[in-house]
């Protein structure tokens, strides 16, 4: 068995969509003590559809630039803060505790219009069987 535990403090952040910070906590590229081997591949079937789990932060008055993902959908879980999200032509307010679903191939952007940092978990998942194969 291979145990994977990842703390955001041990991950280098990257700039996300020009305005936010993103800590990629888990992805298909996550390594433990080497490459993910055949045994791990068999045991972690759910990872075949997950492209990433990230901790994201967005400062007040900033927005992610509008973007879309051709090969995966996303779910955001809002940990802290408030703002609004635009998905396609629809706009909705959000606050801590909300879960937001974003379909693949759909233009979206998130805006922090509150006074504190927006912090959220972003889960990316392949639709269909693109990553894992099979039918």
Feature locations, PLM:
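Short acidic-glycine-tyrosine-enriched beta hairpin
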Residues: 89-104
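Histidine-centered metal-chelating micro-motifs
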Residues: 63-65, 84, 100, 104-110
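Short, conserved beta-strand element in jelly-roll/cupin
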Residues: 56-59, 68-85, 126
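Conserved short histidine dyad/triad with adjacent acidic residue
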Residues: 35-42, 54-69
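A short, N-terminal "cap"/entry segment at the start of jelly-roll beta-barrel domains
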Residues: 1-50, 133-135
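Ligand-binding loop in jelly-roll beta-barrel domains
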Residues: 104-130
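A generic "binding-loop/recognition-motif" signal
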Residues: 60, 71, 90, 106-107, ...
């Amino acid at each position: 068995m291979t145990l994977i535990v990842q703390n955001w403090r041990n991950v280098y952040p990257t700039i996300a969509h020009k305005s936010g910070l993103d800590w990629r906590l888990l992805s298909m590229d996550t390594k433990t003590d080497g490459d993910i081997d055949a045994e791990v591949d068999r045991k972690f079937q759910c990872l075949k559809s997950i492209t990433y789990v990230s901790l994201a932060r967005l400062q007040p008055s900033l927005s992610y630039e509008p973007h879309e993902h051709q090969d995966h959908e996303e779910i955001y879980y809002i940990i802290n803060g408030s703002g609004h999200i635009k998905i396609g032509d629809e706009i909705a307010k959000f606050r801590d505790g909300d879960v937001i679903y974003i379909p693949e191939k759909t233009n979206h952007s998130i805006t922090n219009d509150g006074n504190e940092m927006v912090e959220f978990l972003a889960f990316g998942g392949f639709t269909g069987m693109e990553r894992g194969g099979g039918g």
